């Protein structure tokens, strides 16, 4: 800048007034047009002096505007067709990261300053400036520089906003999906399953089925990538359907209909002393409840483990009955073997020999 002032030969210019009082805002110009003439150098120096004051609206704005226009180079910059674009690009750099109210104040102050400068230029009745290709090129380059500066300042903020929107969309998709209890396999089976759990699981399945019918899945309506989510849903809908069926099967294993469970409870209360149904009783219970015998077996096994403990008398009676049953079965076996041996000996030829062993049954030699 000192070299530019030396070319002008008019002494040192007063420092430009400060910018608007917003913290951490500083814009400096590091490039000037490549020209060896004093006129182009003066135009570069005048551009810096004319742009910065345009962002401050003090009480003596009219006097400052008139002071700017006292210099013909500054007046030419203010009256240049690209001055409005230059000022807008400069203000855009200041608006990056500012609140909406602060950005509006900056724009309002700039409009007032620009209006005063143009009014002063019109009142001065200066002759139309001749064409200056170097000044035109400088204004164009300076506008491009400010636009690039604004893009560099805005890029981190845009990336941060995009990241926040992505995280918000993922959180909303998680919250709008089925409850977590619908994805956890039931640890308890049989009669201990509560009606509340059934209601929660049913609601989760209804939500998933409705999402598949609408071909939208659990999509956040506020997200910007709806098309991508629809594409992914169409691509992986088969896997999601298979997973839903697997989860449904796992839940059905541990649940019994309310009416069937009540009938089993009634039978349990009537046979509490020995709640072990026979095969005939299991068949009858299966017909009355509509359940499979395997479900009935599991139900009573779990119920006995959790809610029933035989007394000492019952254990003794069970062991005694088992002992008598085993003895009767062995006696019937030997009687049957003897009867068959007697009949076979009368009808068989002399060469046929039958032997009976208690541990191996009947053998023929």
From Swiss-Prot:
Pfam families: ELK (PF03789), Homeobox_KN (PF05920), KNOX1 (PF03790), KNOX2 (PF03791). One of its GO terms (molecular function) is DNA binding. The keyword Ligase does not apply. It comes from Oryza sativa subsp. japonica (Rice). GO terms for cellular component: nucleus. Residues 227-247 form the ELK domain. It comes from the Eukaryota. Residues 248-311 bind DNA. The keyword Nucleus applies. The gene is OSH3. This is Homeobox protein knotted-1-like 7.
């Amino acid at each position: 800048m000192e070299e530019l002032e030396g070319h002008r030969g008019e002494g040192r210019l007063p420092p430009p007034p400060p910018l608007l009082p917003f913290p951490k805002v500083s814009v400096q110009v590091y490039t000037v047009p490549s020209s060896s003439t004093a006129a182009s150098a003066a135009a570069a120096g005048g551009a810096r002096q004319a742009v910065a004051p345009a962002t401050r609206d003090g009480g003596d704005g009219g006097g400052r505007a008139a002071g700017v226009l006292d210099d013909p180079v500054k007046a030419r910059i203010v009256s240049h067709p690209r001055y409005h674009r230059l000022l807008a690009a400069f203000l855009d750099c200041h608006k990056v990261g500012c609140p909406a109210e602060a950005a509006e104040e900056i724009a309002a102050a700039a409009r007032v300053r620009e209006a005063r400068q143009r009014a002063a230029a019109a009142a001065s009745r200066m002759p139309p400036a001749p064409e200056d290709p170097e000044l035109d090129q400088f204004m164009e380059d300076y506008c491009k520089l400010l636009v690039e500066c604004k893009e560099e300042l805005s890029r981190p903020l845009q990336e941060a906003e995009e990241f926040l929107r992505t995280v918000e969309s993922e959180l909303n998709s998680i919250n709008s999906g089925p409850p977590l209890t619908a994805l956890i396999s039931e640890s308890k089976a049989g009669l201990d399953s509560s009606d509340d759990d059934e209601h929660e699981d049913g609601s989760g399945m209804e939500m998933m089925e409705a999402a598949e019918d609408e071909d939208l899945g659990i999509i956040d309506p506020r997200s910007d990538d709806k098309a991508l989510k629809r594409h992914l849903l169409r691509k992986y809908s088969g896997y999601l359907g298979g997973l839903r069926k697997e989860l449904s099967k796992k839940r059905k294993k541990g649940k019994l209909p309310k009416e069937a469970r009540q009938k089993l409870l009634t039978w349990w209360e009537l046979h509490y002393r020995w709640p072990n149904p026979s095969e005939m009783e299991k068949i009858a219970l299966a017909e009355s409840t509509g359940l499979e015998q395997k479900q009935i077996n599991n139900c009573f096994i779990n119920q006995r483990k959790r809610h029933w403990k035989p007394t000492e008398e019952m254990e003794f009676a069970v062991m005694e009955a088992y002992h008598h049953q085993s003895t009767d079965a062995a006696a019937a076996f030997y009687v049957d073997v003897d009867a068959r041996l007697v009949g076979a000996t009368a009808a068989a030829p002399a060469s046929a020999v039958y032997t009976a062993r208690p541990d191996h049954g009947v053998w023929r030699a």
